[in-house]
Curated annotation (Swiss-Prot):
The keyword Cytoplasm applies. The lineage of its organism: Bacteria, Bacillati, Cyanobacteriota, Cyanophyceae, Synechococcales. InterPro entries: Cytidylate_kin, Cytidylate_kinase_dom, P-loop_NTPase, Pantoate_ligase, Pantoate_ligase/cytidylate_kin, Pantoate_ligase_C, Rossmann-like_a/b/a_fold. The active site is at residue 36. Pfam families: Cytidylate_kin, Pantoate_ligase. It comes from Prochlorococcus marinus (strain MIT 9312). This is Bifunctional pantoate ligase/cytidylate kinase. Its EC number is 6.3.2.1, 2.7.4.25. Beta-alanine binds at residue 61. Residues 277-510 are annotated as: Cytidylate kinase. Pathway: Cofactor biosynthesis; (R)-pantothenate biosynthesis; (R)-pantothenate from (R)-pantoate and beta-alanine: step 1/1. One of its GO terms (cellular component) is cytosol. It is found in: Cytoplasm.
Length: 510
Protein backbone atom coordinates (compact mmCIF):
# COMPACT_ATOMS: atom_id res chain seq x y z
CA UNK A 1 0.00 0.00 0.00
CA UNK A 2 1.02 3.63 -0.44
CA UNK A 3 3.08 5.04 2.44
CA UNK A 4 1.11 7.63 4.40
CA UNK A 5 1.93 10.28 7.00
CA UNK A 6 -0.99 11.61 9.04
CA UNK A 7 -0.78 14.54 11.47
CA UNK A 8 -4.38 15.37 12.41
CA UNK A 9 -6.74 13.35 14.63
CA UNK A 10 -9.64 13.96 12.24
CA UNK A 11 -7.53 12.62 9.39
CA UNK A 12 -6.62 9.48 11.33
CA UNK A 13 -10.32 8.93 12.12
CA UNK A 14 -11.27 9.25 8.45
CA UNK A 15 -8.41 7.01 7.37
CA UNK A 16 -9.45 4.38 9.93
CA UNK A 17 -13.07 4.43 8.77
CA UNK A 18 -12.02 3.84 5.18
CA UNK A 19 -9.44 1.10 5.63
CA UNK A 20 -10.65 -2.48 5.49
CA UNK A 21 -7.76 -4.15 7.27
CA UNK A 22 -6.54 -5.07 10.73
CA UNK A 23 -3.81 -2.87 12.17
CA UNK A 24 -0.58 -3.50 14.04
CA UNK A 25 0.11 -0.43 16.21
CA UNK A 26 3.60 0.52 17.39
CA UNK A 27 3.50 3.62 19.64
CA UNK A 28 6.78 5.54 20.06
CA UNK A 29 8.07 8.85 21.38
CA UNK A 30 10.50 9.24 18.50
CA UNK A 31 14.32 9.28 18.47
CA UNK A 32 14.05 5.75 17.10
CA UNK A 33 16.86 3.24 17.60
CA UNK A 34 17.50 -0.43 16.80
CA UNK A 35 15.00 -1.52 19.45
CA UNK A 36 12.25 0.35 17.62
CA UNK A 37 13.45 -1.12 14.33
CA UNK A 38 12.99 -4.61 15.78
CA UNK A 39 9.50 -3.74 17.06
CA UNK A 40 8.40 -2.43 13.66
CA UNK A 41 9.94 -5.27 11.65
CA UNK A 42 8.56 -7.90 14.06
CA UNK A 43 5.07 -6.53 13.52
CA UNK A 44 5.63 -6.41 9.76
CA UNK A 45 6.78 -10.03 9.59
CA UNK A 46 4.07 -11.36 11.92
CA UNK A 47 1.09 -11.00 9.59
CA UNK A 48 -0.38 -9.12 6.63
CA UNK A 49 -1.91 -6.33 8.74
CA UNK A 50 -1.30 -2.64 8.12
CA UNK A 51 1.57 -1.39 10.30
CA UNK A 52 0.99 1.99 11.94
CA UNK A 53 3.74 3.76 13.89
CA UNK A 54 2.92 6.78 16.04
CA UNK A 55 5.52 9.39 16.97
CA UNK A 56 4.36 11.57 19.83
CA UNK A 57 6.40 12.99 22.71
CA UNK A 58 3.81 12.84 25.47
CA UNK A 59 4.23 15.76 27.90
CA UNK A 60 2.28 13.94 30.62
CA UNK A 61 5.10 11.39 30.97
CA UNK A 62 7.78 13.90 31.98
CA UNK A 63 8.73 14.93 35.50
CA UNK A 64 9.57 18.50 34.58
CA UNK A 65 9.62 20.96 31.69
CA UNK A 66 13.40 20.79 31.33
CA UNK A 67 13.33 17.01 30.88
CA UNK A 68 10.67 17.38 28.19
CA UNK A 69 12.62 20.10 26.35
CA UNK A 70 15.82 18.03 26.42
CA UNK A 71 14.20 14.87 25.06
CA UNK A 72 15.84 14.11 21.67
CA UNK A 73 13.64 15.00 18.70
CA UNK A 74 14.73 13.51 15.35
CA UNK A 75 11.50 13.44 13.35
CA UNK A 76 12.96 13.25 9.81
CA UNK A 77 15.19 10.31 10.72
CA UNK A 78 12.30 8.67 12.61
CA UNK A 79 10.12 8.79 9.49
CA UNK A 80 12.94 7.25 7.42
CA UNK A 81 13.55 4.45 9.96
CA UNK A 82 9.84 3.69 10.32
CA UNK A 83 9.21 3.28 6.60
CA UNK A 84 12.44 1.35 6.00
CA UNK A 85 11.53 -1.20 8.67
CA UNK A 86 7.96 -1.89 7.65
CA UNK A 87 5.66 0.97 8.64
CA UNK A 88 2.81 1.61 6.21
CA UNK A 89 1.39 4.61 8.04
CA UNK A 90 2.98 7.09 10.45
CA UNK A 91 0.85 9.19 12.79
CA UNK A 92 2.65 12.34 14.02
CA UNK A 93 0.16 14.43 15.99
CA UNK A 94 0.99 17.66 17.81
CA UNK A 95 0.31 18.09 21.52
CA UNK A 96 -2.69 20.26 20.65
CA UNK A 97 -4.12 17.46 18.51
CA UNK A 98 -3.94 14.94 21.37
CA UNK A 99 -4.78 17.34 24.21
CA UNK A 100 -6.78 20.21 22.62
CA UNK A 101 -6.92 23.20 24.94
CA UNK A 102 -10.57 23.87 24.16
CA UNK A 103 -11.67 20.29 24.88
CA UNK A 104 -12.88 19.77 28.43
CA UNK A 105 -13.79 16.12 27.84
CA UNK A 106 -10.30 14.60 27.67
CA UNK A 107 -10.19 11.35 29.64
CA UNK A 108 -7.26 11.51 32.07
CA UNK A 109 -6.59 8.05 33.49
CA UNK A 110 -4.94 6.83 36.67
CA UNK A 111 -2.60 3.84 36.59
CA UNK A 112 -3.44 1.14 39.18
CA UNK A 113 -1.56 1.83 42.42
CA UNK A 114 -0.64 -1.82 42.92
CA UNK A 115 1.41 -1.71 39.71
CA UNK A 116 2.55 1.92 39.63
CA UNK A 117 3.64 2.61 43.21
CA UNK A 118 6.92 0.64 43.08
CA UNK A 119 10.02 0.77 40.85
CA UNK A 120 9.77 3.76 38.47
CA UNK A 121 6.56 4.89 40.13
CA UNK A 122 8.40 5.69 43.38
CA UNK A 123 10.00 8.85 42.01
CA UNK A 124 8.16 9.49 38.75
CA UNK A 125 4.86 10.60 40.22
CA UNK A 126 2.12 10.71 37.58
CA UNK A 127 4.32 9.22 34.84
CA UNK A 128 2.25 6.07 34.38
CA UNK A 129 -0.98 8.08 34.55
CA UNK A 130 0.33 9.93 31.50
CA UNK A 131 1.21 6.66 29.76
CA UNK A 132 -2.29 5.27 30.33
CA UNK A 133 -3.95 8.50 29.21
CA UNK A 134 -2.12 8.80 25.90
CA UNK A 135 -2.20 5.10 24.99
CA UNK A 136 -5.93 4.90 25.74
CA UNK A 137 -6.51 7.93 23.50
CA UNK A 138 -4.40 6.46 20.68
CA UNK A 139 -6.04 3.04 20.92
CA UNK A 140 -9.48 4.61 20.62
CA UNK A 141 -8.36 6.62 17.59
CA UNK A 142 -6.59 3.79 15.77
CA UNK A 143 -8.56 0.72 16.94
CA UNK A 144 -5.72 -1.73 16.23
CA UNK A 145 -5.84 -5.52 16.27
CA UNK A 146 -2.40 -5.78 17.87
CA UNK A 147 -0.35 -3.46 20.07
CA UNK A 148 3.43 -4.02 19.91
CA UNK A 149 5.50 -3.09 22.97
CA UNK A 150 9.00 -3.78 24.26
CA UNK A 151 9.78 -5.65 27.47
CA UNK A 152 12.51 -3.14 28.38
CA UNK A 153 9.80 -1.02 30.00
CA UNK A 154 8.43 -4.03 31.89
CA UNK A 155 6.43 -2.07 34.47
CA UNK A 156 4.82 -0.01 31.71
CA UNK A 157 3.97 -3.21 29.81
CA UNK A 158 2.17 -4.63 32.87
CA UNK A 159 0.24 -1.40 33.39
CA UNK A 160 -0.88 -1.30 29.74
CA UNK A 161 -1.95 -4.95 29.90
CA UNK A 162 -4.05 -3.97 32.91
CA UNK A 163 -5.48 -1.01 30.96
CA UNK A 164 -6.56 -3.25 28.08
CA UNK A 165 -8.12 -5.70 30.53
CA UNK A 166 -9.99 -3.20 32.71
CA UNK A 167 -11.22 -1.11 29.77
CA UNK A 168 -12.19 -4.31 27.89
CA UNK A 169 -10.37 -3.16 24.77
CA UNK A 170 -10.37 -5.49 21.78
CA UNK A 171 -6.62 -5.47 21.20
CA UNK A 172 -3.91 -8.10 21.69
CA UNK A 173 -0.63 -6.99 23.24
CA UNK A 174 2.47 -8.47 21.60
CA UNK A 175 5.81 -7.96 23.34
CA UNK A 176 9.42 -8.40 22.26
CA UNK A 177 12.49 -8.98 24.47
CA UNK A 178 14.69 -6.12 25.65
CA UNK A 179 16.98 -5.14 22.79
CA UNK A 180 20.60 -4.46 23.74
CA UNK A 181 23.43 -2.52 22.16
CA UNK A 182 26.81 -3.97 21.17
CA UNK A 183 28.12 -3.52 24.74
CA UNK A 184 25.12 -5.11 26.47
CA UNK A 185 23.28 -2.02 27.69
CA UNK A 186 19.56 -1.79 26.87
CA UNK A 187 18.75 0.39 23.89
CA UNK A 188 17.10 3.64 24.94
CA UNK A 189 16.32 6.95 23.29
CA UNK A 190 18.16 8.61 26.18
CA UNK A 191 21.46 6.83 25.50
CA UNK A 192 22.50 9.69 23.18
CA UNK A 193 23.01 11.87 26.29
CA UNK A 194 25.62 9.52 27.78
CA UNK A 195 29.29 10.45 27.90
CA UNK A 196 31.86 7.68 27.43
CA UNK A 197 32.38 7.44 31.19
CA UNK A 198 28.64 7.39 31.90
CA UNK A 199 28.20 4.63 29.34
CA UNK A 200 30.84 2.58 31.17
CA UNK A 201 28.81 2.94 34.36
CA UNK A 202 25.56 1.75 32.79
CA UNK A 203 27.49 -1.11 31.19
CA UNK A 204 28.82 -2.10 34.62
CA UNK A 205 25.27 -1.92 36.03
CA UNK A 206 23.82 -4.13 33.28
CA UNK A 207 26.72 -6.57 33.63
CA UNK A 208 26.14 -6.93 37.38
CA UNK A 209 22.48 -7.76 36.75
CA UNK A 210 23.56 -10.52 34.37
CA UNK A 211 26.08 -11.82 36.92
CA UNK A 212 23.30 -11.89 39.53
CA UNK A 213 21.15 -13.87 37.08
CA UNK A 214 23.91 -16.42 36.51
CA UNK A 215 24.50 -16.76 40.26
CA UNK A 216 20.78 -17.21 40.86
CA UNK A 217 20.65 -20.11 38.41
CA UNK A 218 23.21 -21.89 40.57
CA UNK A 219 22.27 -20.80 44.10
CA UNK A 220 18.51 -20.09 43.71
CA UNK A 221 18.86 -16.96 45.84
CA UNK A 222 19.96 -13.36 45.47
CA UNK A 223 21.95 -10.97 47.65
CA UNK A 224 20.69 -7.45 47.00
CA UNK A 225 23.04 -5.83 49.53
CA UNK A 226 26.08 -7.31 47.81
CA UNK A 227 24.97 -6.02 44.40
CA UNK A 228 24.27 -2.55 45.80
CA UNK A 229 27.71 -2.48 47.44
CA UNK A 230 29.39 -3.33 44.12
CA UNK A 231 27.47 -0.59 42.32
CA UNK A 232 28.12 1.97 45.05
CA UNK A 233 31.84 1.17 44.95
CA UNK A 234 31.79 2.39 41.32
CA UNK A 235 30.07 5.58 42.50
CA UNK A 236 26.91 4.64 40.61
CA UNK A 237 23.87 6.62 41.77
CA UNK A 238 21.17 4.01 42.44
CA UNK A 239 17.56 5.18 42.33
CA UNK A 240 16.23 1.71 43.14
CA UNK A 241 17.16 -1.96 42.92
CA UNK A 242 14.41 -4.42 43.81
CA UNK A 243 13.73 -8.16 43.63
CA UNK A 244 10.01 -8.62 42.94
CA UNK A 245 7.36 -10.95 41.61
CA UNK A 246 7.30 -10.14 37.87
CA UNK A 247 3.52 -9.71 37.56
CA UNK A 248 2.35 -8.32 40.90
CA UNK A 249 5.50 -6.23 41.47
CA UNK A 250 5.28 -7.20 45.13
CA UNK A 251 8.23 -8.58 47.09
CA UNK A 252 9.38 -11.90 45.69
CA UNK A 253 8.68 -14.99 47.80
CA UNK A 254 10.84 -18.07 48.25
CA UNK A 255 8.32 -20.26 46.42
CA UNK A 256 8.24 -18.06 43.30
CA UNK A 257 9.79 -19.85 40.33
CA UNK A 258 10.17 -16.64 38.35
CA UNK A 259 11.04 -13.18 39.65
CA UNK A 260 12.47 -9.92 38.35
CA UNK A 261 15.56 -8.03 39.46
CA UNK A 262 14.95 -4.46 38.31
CA UNK A 263 16.89 -1.28 38.85
CA UNK A 264 17.27 2.36 37.84
CA UNK A 265 20.42 4.44 38.02
CA UNK A 266 21.34 8.02 37.20
CA UNK A 267 24.32 8.89 35.06
CA UNK A 268 24.73 12.66 35.10
CA UNK A 269 21.38 14.05 34.00
CA UNK A 270 20.28 10.78 32.41
CA UNK A 271 18.14 8.19 34.15
CA UNK A 272 18.31 4.61 32.82
CA UNK A 273 16.56 1.36 33.71
CA UNK A 274 17.40 -2.31 33.25
CA UNK A 275 16.21 -5.67 34.53
CA UNK A 276 16.75 -9.40 34.34
CA UNK A 277 14.34 -12.25 34.98
CA UNK A 278 15.43 -14.88 37.48
CA UNK A 279 14.16 -18.44 37.09
CA UNK A 280 14.73 -21.50 39.26
CA UNK A 281 13.79 -23.64 36.29
CA UNK A 282 12.46 -23.13 32.76
CA UNK A 283 8.68 -22.76 32.31
CA UNK A 284 6.26 -25.70 32.30
CA UNK A 285 2.91 -25.95 30.51
CA UNK A 286 0.49 -28.52 31.97
CA UNK A 287 -2.34 -29.67 29.71
CA UNK A 288 -5.02 -31.90 31.21
CA UNK A 289 -8.29 -33.19 29.85
CA UNK A 290 -10.36 -36.26 29.05
CA UNK A 291 -9.69 -38.80 26.30
CA UNK A 292 -10.21 -37.51 22.77
CA UNK A 293 -10.04 -33.82 23.64
CA UNK A 294 -7.07 -33.32 21.32
CA UNK A 295 -4.39 -33.11 24.01
CA UNK A 296 -1.71 -35.14 22.23
CA UNK A 297 -1.92 -33.36 18.88
CA UNK A 298 -2.12 -29.91 20.46
CA UNK A 299 0.71 -30.59 22.91
CA UNK A 300 3.04 -31.89 20.20
CA UNK A 301 2.50 -28.79 18.07
CA UNK A 302 3.01 -26.45 21.03
CA UNK A 303 6.24 -28.22 21.95
CA UNK A 304 7.50 -27.83 18.39
CA UNK A 305 6.53 -24.15 18.06
CA UNK A 306 7.89 -23.13 21.47
CA UNK A 307 10.92 -25.46 21.32
CA UNK A 308 9.85 -27.25 24.50
CA UNK A 309 10.20 -30.91 25.43
CA UNK A 310 7.00 -32.86 24.80
CA UNK A 311 6.20 -35.07 27.78
CA UNK A 312 3.42 -37.48 26.83
CA UNK A 313 2.49 -38.89 30.24
CA UNK A 314 -0.43 -40.81 28.80
CA UNK A 315 2.00 -42.69 26.57
CA UNK A 316 3.96 -43.68 29.68
CA UNK A 317 0.86 -45.29 31.24
CA UNK A 318 0.01 -46.93 27.93
CA UNK A 319 3.56 -48.24 27.50
CA UNK A 320 3.46 -49.80 30.95
CA UNK A 321 0.06 -51.34 30.17
CA UNK A 322 1.52 -52.78 26.96
CA UNK A 323 4.43 -54.33 28.87
CA UNK A 324 2.13 -55.95 31.43
CA UNK A 325 0.14 -57.57 28.61
CA UNK A 326 3.31 -58.66 26.79
CA UNK A 327 4.81 -60.19 29.93
CA UNK A 328 1.45 -61.73 30.82
CA UNK A 329 1.49 -60.08 34.24
CA UNK A 330 -1.74 -59.67 36.16
CA UNK A 331 -1.69 -56.06 37.35
CA UNK A 332 -3.81 -57.10 40.33
CA UNK A 333 -0.93 -59.17 41.72
CA UNK A 334 0.89 -56.58 43.81
CA UNK A 335 4.23 -58.39 44.22
CA UNK A 336 4.66 -59.10 40.51
CA UNK A 337 3.75 -55.52 39.72
CA UNK A 338 6.26 -54.13 42.22
CA UNK A 339 9.00 -56.37 40.81
CA UNK A 340 8.48 -55.25 37.23
CA UNK A 341 8.38 -51.58 38.24
CA UNK A 342 11.95 -51.92 39.57
CA UNK A 343 13.31 -52.63 36.10
CA UNK A 344 11.29 -50.34 33.85
CA UNK A 345 12.86 -47.74 31.59
CA UNK A 346 10.60 -45.43 29.55
CA UNK A 347 12.35 -43.15 27.07
CA UNK A 348 11.14 -40.66 24.45
CA UNK A 349 13.21 -40.27 21.27
CA UNK A 350 12.75 -38.09 18.19
CA UNK A 351 12.40 -40.04 14.95
CA UNK A 352 13.28 -39.16 11.36
CA UNK A 353 9.80 -37.68 10.80
CA UNK A 354 10.37 -35.10 13.59
CA UNK A 355 7.89 -37.05 15.69
CA UNK A 356 8.41 -38.68 19.08
CA UNK A 357 8.71 -42.43 19.60
CA UNK A 358 8.06 -44.16 22.92
CA UNK A 359 10.40 -46.91 24.12
CA UNK A 360 9.86 -49.17 27.12
CA UNK A 361 12.76 -51.45 28.04
CA UNK A 362 14.21 -50.77 24.56
CA UNK A 363 10.97 -51.75 22.74
CA UNK A 364 9.55 -49.08 20.41
CA UNK A 365 5.82 -49.16 21.20
CA UNK A 366 4.64 -45.90 19.59
CA UNK A 367 1.92 -47.52 17.48
CA UNK A 368 1.10 -50.52 19.66
CA UNK A 369 0.06 -48.45 22.68
CA UNK A 370 -2.76 -46.77 20.71
CA UNK A 371 -4.66 -50.03 20.19
CA UNK A 372 -8.16 -50.56 21.54
CA UNK A 373 -6.81 -53.35 23.76
CA UNK A 374 -4.54 -50.89 25.57
CA UNK A 375 -7.27 -48.22 25.71
CA UNK A 376 -9.60 -50.67 27.45
CA UNK A 377 -7.25 -51.32 30.39
CA UNK A 378 -5.03 -48.25 30.76
CA UNK A 379 -7.47 -46.42 33.04
CA UNK A 380 -7.55 -49.37 35.45
CA UNK A 381 -3.77 -49.69 35.46
CA UNK A 382 -3.25 -45.95 35.89
CA UNK A 383 -5.47 -46.01 38.98
CA UNK A 384 -3.11 -48.42 40.79
CA UNK A 385 -1.28 -46.57 43.57
CA UNK A 386 2.13 -48.13 42.92
CA UNK A 387 1.93 -47.42 39.19
CA UNK A 388 0.97 -43.78 39.65
CA UNK A 389 3.60 -43.16 42.30
CA UNK A 390 6.29 -44.69 40.10
CA UNK A 391 5.36 -42.80 36.93
CA UNK A 392 4.66 -39.48 38.67
CA UNK A 393 8.15 -39.66 40.17
CA UNK A 394 9.61 -40.42 36.73
CA UNK A 395 7.72 -37.49 35.22
CA UNK A 396 8.92 -35.11 37.94
CA UNK A 397 12.52 -36.18 37.33
CA UNK A 398 12.12 -35.32 33.65
CA UNK A 399 10.62 -31.95 34.62
CA UNK A 400 13.18 -30.91 37.24
CA UNK A 401 14.75 -28.32 34.95
CA UNK A 402 11.44 -27.38 33.27
CA UNK A 403 11.32 -26.38 29.64
CA UNK A 404 8.53 -28.78 28.77
CA UNK A 405 4.87 -29.14 27.92
CA UNK A 406 3.17 -32.16 29.44
CA UNK A 407 -0.26 -33.63 28.79
CA UNK A 408 -2.30 -36.11 30.76
CA UNK A 409 -5.07 -36.17 33.33
CA UNK A 410 -3.35 -35.05 36.52
CA UNK A 411 -0.49 -32.88 35.28
CA UNK A 412 -1.65 -29.58 36.75
CA UNK A 413 -3.03 -31.12 39.95
CA UNK A 414 -0.45 -33.78 40.85
CA UNK A 415 2.63 -33.97 38.63
CA UNK A 416 3.41 -30.26 38.14
CA UNK A 417 1.10 -28.28 40.45
CA UNK A 418 3.52 -25.33 40.15
CA UNK A 419 3.35 -25.16 36.33
CA UNK A 420 3.34 -21.61 34.99
CA UNK A 421 0.43 -22.32 32.65
CA UNK A 422 -2.30 -24.90 33.25
CA UNK A 423 -4.81 -25.75 30.54
CA UNK A 424 -7.87 -27.98 30.84
CA UNK A 425 -8.69 -29.09 27.31
CA UNK A 426 -12.08 -30.62 26.72
CA UNK A 427 -14.83 -31.23 24.15
CA UNK A 428 -18.26 -32.82 23.98
CA UNK A 429 -18.48 -36.62 23.88
CA UNK A 430 -19.88 -36.46 20.33
CA UNK A 431 -16.92 -34.40 19.16
CA UNK A 432 -14.37 -36.60 20.90
CA UNK A 433 -15.91 -39.79 19.48
CA UNK A 434 -15.79 -38.37 15.94
CA UNK A 435 -12.13 -37.46 16.39
CA UNK A 436 -11.23 -40.91 17.70
CA UNK A 437 -13.05 -42.59 14.82
CA UNK A 438 -11.30 -40.36 12.28
CA UNK A 439 -7.94 -40.94 13.96
CA UNK A 440 -8.35 -44.71 13.87
CA UNK A 441 -9.47 -44.61 10.24
CA UNK A 442 -6.42 -42.57 9.22
CA UNK A 443 -4.16 -45.12 10.89
CA UNK A 444 -5.90 -48.01 9.09
CA UNK A 445 -7.07 -49.41 12.40
CA UNK A 446 -10.03 -51.73 12.65
CA UNK A 447 -13.31 -49.88 12.02
CA UNK A 448 -15.25 -49.17 15.21
CA UNK A 449 -18.88 -48.14 15.61
CA UNK A 450 -19.39 -44.48 16.59
CA UNK A 451 -21.99 -45.35 19.22
CA UNK A 452 -19.63 -47.88 20.76
CA UNK A 453 -16.88 -45.26 20.82
CA UNK A 454 -19.15 -42.85 22.71
CA UNK A 455 -19.91 -45.51 25.30
CA UNK A 456 -16.21 -46.31 25.70
CA UNK A 457 -15.40 -42.61 26.16
CA UNK A 458 -18.16 -42.20 28.77
CA UNK A 459 -16.83 -45.24 30.61
CA UNK A 460 -13.27 -43.90 30.50
CA UNK A 461 -14.40 -40.48 31.73
CA UNK A 462 -16.20 -42.06 34.67
CA UNK A 463 -13.22 -44.20 35.61
CA UNK A 464 -10.73 -41.33 35.30
CA UNK A 465 -12.88 -38.89 37.25
CA UNK A 466 -13.77 -41.28 40.06
CA UNK A 467 -10.51 -43.09 40.73
CA UNK A 468 -9.23 -42.72 44.27
CA UNK A 469 -5.73 -41.60 43.32
CA UNK A 470 -5.18 -38.43 41.24
CA UNK A 471 -8.61 -38.32 39.57
CA UNK A 472 -9.20 -36.29 36.43
CA UNK A 473 -10.23 -32.87 37.72
CA UNK A 474 -9.62 -29.33 36.55
CA UNK A 475 -6.97 -27.53 38.63
CA UNK A 476 -8.29 -24.42 40.38
CA UNK A 477 -5.96 -22.17 38.40
CA UNK A 478 -6.33 -23.97 35.06
CA UNK A 479 -7.82 -22.22 32.03
CA UNK A 480 -10.56 -24.31 30.41
CA UNK A 481 -10.64 -24.45 26.62
CA UNK A 482 -13.61 -26.16 24.92
CA UNK A 483 -12.44 -27.30 21.50
CA UNK A 484 -15.77 -28.09 19.79
CA UNK A 485 -15.78 -26.38 16.41
CA UNK A 486 -12.16 -25.25 16.75
CA UNK A 487 -9.35 -26.24 14.43
CA UNK A 488 -6.15 -27.65 15.90
CA UNK A 489 -4.25 -24.51 14.89
CA UNK A 490 -6.80 -22.25 16.58
CA UNK A 491 -6.39 -24.14 19.86
CA UNK A 492 -2.60 -24.15 19.56
CA UNK A 493 -2.48 -20.41 18.83
CA UNK A 494 -4.75 -19.66 21.79
CA UNK A 495 -2.53 -21.61 24.20
CA UNK A 496 0.63 -20.01 22.81
CA UNK A 497 -0.94 -16.56 23.28
CA UNK A 498 -1.70 -17.48 26.91
CA UNK A 499 1.87 -18.70 27.35
CA UNK A 500 3.32 -15.50 25.89
CA UNK A 501 1.09 -13.49 28.21
CA UNK A 502 2.39 -15.36 31.27
CA UNK A 503 6.03 -15.89 30.32
CA UNK A 504 8.31 -12.96 29.40
CA UNK A 505 9.74 -13.28 25.90
CA UNK A 506 13.23 -12.76 27.31
CA UNK A 507 13.00 -16.04 29.21
CA UNK A 508 11.88 -17.90 26.08
CA UNK A 509 15.09 -17.23 24.13
CA UNK A 510 16.94 -20.51 23.57
Amino acid sequence: MKKVIIRKTEEIKNWRRNINSDINFIPTMGNLHNGHKTLISTAKNANSNVNLVSIFVNPLQFDNKSDLENYPKTIDNDIKISFENGADVIFIPSTEEIYPSDNKNITFLKAPLELSSSLCGLNRIGHFDGVCTVVYKLLNLIKPKNLYLGEKDWQQLLILKNLVLTKKLDVAIKSIPTQRDFDGIPLSSRNVHLSNNERKLIRFFSHELLVAKENFQQEKKINLKEIIQKLSAQKISIEYLEHLHPYTLQESKVEDNISILAGAIRCGETRLIDHVFLMKRSPIIAIDGPAGSGKSTVTQLIAKKLKLLYLDTGAMYRALSWLLIKENIDYKEEKKLQNILKDISIVFKSNTNSQQDVFINNYCVTEEIRSQEISSIVSKISSIKEVREFLVEEQRKIGESGGLVAEGRDIGTTVFPDAELKIFLTASIDERAKRRKSDKKSKDSQEIDLHKLKELIKKRDFEDSNREISPLIKANDAIEIITDGCSINEVVDKIIDLYNDKIPKETQIR
